């Protein structure tokens, strides 16, 4: 389960970076050249999702929980926004959901 969680975390970072770089270009006036590493990051994201040993729908559902937590870490570290109690509780609920889904992979 730890391996799947770490893979989900790296996958989430690839997706967030792939979306953040175009945001910098569109909203913050950064260089259009950021679209190249953004495309590479999103391609990496898609490839990483294929590495999980479960049906794609289960992978996407479980990944969602880790994505929520990773996005909140990004919010704190990159955007420098203090997380609220609701952020922490929401991340915990999402991660518990992910753990339940991943635990079911062994049953099937």
From Swiss-Prot:
Main location: membrane
Superkingdom per UniProt: Bacteria
InterPro entries assigned: UPF0060
Intracellular or extracellular location(s): Cell inner membrane
UniProt topology in membrane: Multi-pass membrane protein
This protein's record includes keyword Cell inner membrane: yes
TM region(s), chain numbering: 6-26, 29-49, 59-79, 85-105
Alphabetized UniProt keyword annotations: Cell inner membrane, Cell membrane, Membrane, Transmembrane, Transmembrane helix
Gene Ontology cellular component terms for the protein in this record: plasma membrane
HAMAP family, A to Z: UPF0060
Family per similarity comment: Belongs to the UPF0060 family.
Name of protein: UPF0060 membrane protein YE2027
């Amino acid at each position: 389960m730890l391996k799947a969680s770490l893979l989900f975390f790296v996958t989430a970072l690839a997706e967030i970076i792939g979306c953040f770089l175009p945001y910098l270009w569109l909203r913050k006036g950064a260089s259009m050249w950021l679209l190249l590493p953004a495309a590479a990051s999103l391609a990496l994201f898609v490839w990483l999702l294929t590495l999980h040993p479960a049906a794609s729908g289960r992978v996407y559902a479980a990944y969602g929980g880790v994505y929520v937590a990773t996005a909140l870490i990004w919010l704190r570290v990159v955007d420098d926004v203090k997380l609220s109690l609701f952020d922490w509780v929401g991340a915990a609920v999402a991660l518990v959901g992910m753990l339940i889904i991943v635990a079911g992979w062994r049953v099937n």
